[in-house]
Amino acid sequence: SAFNLNKKLIYLESGLRTNNVKDPFPEEGYRQMVSRIADINFCPTSYSASNLYSEQTKGKIHVVGNTVLDNIKKDRSDTSYGNTCLITLHRNENLNILDLWLNEIERFASNHPEIEFIFPAHPNPIILKACENLKKIKVVKPLQHRNLIDILKKCKFVITDSGGIQEEGCFLNKKIIVCRKTTERPEGIPTGHIVMCEDP
């Protein structure tokens, strides 16, 4: 819309890349297109800024950090390591195989009764259908962000396909299993926080 109206465009969270324009679809394509027309690009990390420099992006590039993480910093409650696993799965590319993911997690949960597996389920009918017969995974309604962060702070590890959870989990020093083929937030891989898991 800004481009069509010939308005200045500031792109927050710019520079995130999987470098596969169709994965995730359509987000990656939009990200690449918007950064090319943005007048100012605000990047969360130096890595995301380096993506824009390598693409010879014409707009101004600034590394400004992450406002979500800034908000978490304000909450000074302790981060602990309890016996909880937080699950978030909602991406389009996983919907067709969501039952496979959940079956594998359910099997793992059966072998680890000491861990409570919590899944705040997106209200998508496909997701709710896949949750109907789960016995070892506690399915709950979507949570407010603060409540989600409270669980994240106390959990032992995370299973997710969410980009935001990857950022927040790394910041809180959690182990994260990412149920995707690619990630636009790879900074947590070399630190050992993120483990990519392509298939159920």
Protein language model features and the residues they cover:
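Nucleotide-activated sugar donor-binding and catalytic core shared by glycosyltransferases
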Residues: 1-119, 124-200
